[in-house]
Amino acid sequence: MTGHRFRISIVRFIASYFIAVAIAAFATSARAQANIDVDERRTTPVPHRYIHGILGDAKFQIALPDNWNGEFAMGARGFSGDENASGAFKTVGLQKGYAYALSDQGWNRFTIIDQPEDKYYESRRRILQLTQYTKALISRYYGKPARRTFMVGGSNGGHNTKMMVEDYPEEYDGGLAGYGITSHIEWMGSNTRFVRNFDVIASRIDDIIVKRTARPNWDPATTPLSPPLTPDQLQALLNIYNMPAHVGGLAFNIGRVPGSEYRWPPASAKWPLGSYTAILGYATTSVAKFDRFYDPNGDGVLSLDEIKAWDPNLSPPPVANDLRRFDNTGDLQHPIIIGHGSHDPIVSPGETLVYKRLVEARFGVAGARKLLAVYFIPGMGHGGAEYDAALPAMFNALEAWVDYRESGGRTGSPPPNVLVGGLGSYPRN
């Protein structure tokens, strides 16, 4: 090649390179542009600027309090929620001065089956996208960046909180993860196992609840009801208590705990806290999306009985390969506080127990206590007034813990051995 041609080639290469960089920068900028449909002043729970819009294909809300504490609480919604399903996290956060944001994550539980482009895994990208967008907005609005950013959320949002703090330690300084899923594939499998086994014991659930209430340590295998359960009924009851599962190489029990039976039936005047219908609903709206191969009789439609029979252990490898990407790992660099109801029928307390073990497997028991604090709330189901009333104390504990870690113990404090909430006190697990 002549020197002239060589110089032309170099010039073309450099020009092409900078054009590519410019295009990439433009694309990134375009992706970060939000379409705002509401930007207004609101006064409850405290005076703040409220913004609503769409970023990518995800709807969002942002709240910027007048009395800003210099920090940012990034929310994560529940499995059935949207960008407005903030629960008490927004209320308490704004009252304490945090800027707050929440995304619908680009998918909806009730329509995702009809939207091929929507994926559960999209949550990670959409949460990160809104986090970065809100941080930039905070800097412009208040004239300085947020000093800290926390992830907060319950249920699916509790899972997302753990996921984002694990995966993006440069973005988040810690999190409040309420009653969260640890493995989505195991959680959905536990839902179908629950409903198909509950159907077998449904005619005897009143007797089971009465017996458990009278004798909290009752063992149905050794102390029969009168009249006794049939062998099939006894096995079905035991199947609800004991559901083998695994995540991150650890085996655990994702079953529903003894003592929570009053939360199992369909909700009714007699059993107002019953959750059967809700658990069945998760399965009916989700199994076909979780497992695109599942169609036992090949007719292209999943019947209710087929949905109840789904078992992820029998699904082909691509199902686990896809959904296991969503498993929490326990790989923390910043602290997380978890609150979970001891009688939760929707997300088994076993999911939080195994998450604690995941962290311990990486850092040892002593090391895990420097990164994770777990509090079980006696008798609470899937979230509730007890958790909401404890949120101010949890925010305070997280702030003090981060202070303690960042200062090398000179300021702040580790998480309390007993968390004193508004409706009770809860020992650290």
Regions found by a protein language model. Give the residues of each.
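N-terminal secretory signal peptides that target proteins for export/translocation
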Residues: 1-11
